[in-house]
Amino acid sequence: MESLTLFRNDFPEEEIHVVAGHQVVTMENIEVLALFVRQGLPNGLSLHETVDRVKELGGIPVLPWGVGKWFGKRGKIIKEFLVNHEKGNLFLGDNGGRPCFWPTPNLFNLAEKTGVVVLPGSDPLPFPSEALRVGSFGFSLQENSLHGDSPTKCLKNALLSPNVTISPFGCLQENRLFFLNQFRLRRIS
């Protein structure tokens, strides 16, 4: 599986790598991103089974933050999972849709203490205006980390390296836009 590599005409030395992946919803109603996985995974497995399947397929599992999705019972399940997980090959995901006023989620602090890296990403909502947000919140890696025959393999190896340095970029969502988008989401669901 190779990534799609994009170059900007105005900055040809800068590359953007897009890799295969998809979202799965567990039995506990927790979202898991399966990065570097093209093969579909079934929804409805337990969190443990889902993460194990992603790893078996050579992927990287990411538990993405979402508004209200890490509170209550689901938050407790994720917390327990973070505390008891096998080290390596698990990430949490932040997203640019988190509003400016929202404090850093407690599970991100726990992740740091347990050696789990937080990967930022834009995660735009399904509205035309959100298309402009794609790639506006994310991370970069050290300059030479993606050189080699396979950018996908290099990216995956860099992310799994115990010495990985994630350099986040972008801003959290403006409060007014956050509330507007949440209102719009509830109207369409």
Sequence positions of predicted segments:
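Short charge-dense sequence patches
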Residues: 1-6, 55-62, 102
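Well-ordered, non-membrane alpha-helical segments in soluble/globular domains
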Residues: 1-6, 43-50, 77-78, 107
